[in-house]
Amino acid sequence: MSWQAYVDDHLMCDIEGHEDHRLTAAAIVGHDGSVWAQSATFPQFKPEEMNGIMTDFNEPGHLAPTGLHLGGTKYMVIQGEAGAVIRGKKGSGGITIKKTGQALVFGIYEEPVTPGQCNMVVERLGDYLLEQGM
């Protein structure tokens, strides 16, 4: 399966039990910031934004004072799982980022999608990739 198929079929899909509820944008990005696959709606990000995200995975709490920035959008960092998941909130939407051995799985959402639904979609794919040694 291509990386694009993972984004299209497992991240940008209808959320279980909620037809027409899907993430706003999604991507799979290597730890080095190289995009493996992304939705057409995923924001263009700056290298320093990706560096900040990677630093927060290695030093949990790094982004808390300044917020998480992606594509020029600032998210308030909320509770995640140290070294494994970063979650952010902005207005009625937010972001979930799951770290795997080689990649970061991104999901961005807006209402009516809930934070929990975004977490489920992103973390399920991230856990699968971890099981596959990715």
Curated annotation (Swiss-Prot):
Q: Please name the PANTHER family in this protein's record.
A: PROFILIN (PTHR11604), PROFILIN-5 (PTHR11604:SF25)
Keyword annotations: Actin-binding, Allergen, Cytoplasm, Cytoskeleton, Disulfide bond, Phosphoprotein
Organism expressing this protein natively: Olea europaea
Checking Pfam families in the record gives:
Profilin (PF00235)
**A GO molecular-function annotation:** actin monomer binding
Q: Note the InterPro entries from the entry.
A: PFN (IPR048278), PFN_euk (IPR005455), PFN_sf (IPR036140), Profilin_CS (IPR027310)
- Is this entry keyworded Disulfide bond? yes
Its protein name is Profilin-1
> What function does this protein fulfil?
Binds to actin and affects the structure of the cytoskeleton. At high concentrations, profilin prevents the polymerization of actin, whereas it enhances it at low concentrations.
Keyword NADP on this protein? no
Q: How is it modified after translation?
A: Phosphorylated by MAP kinases.
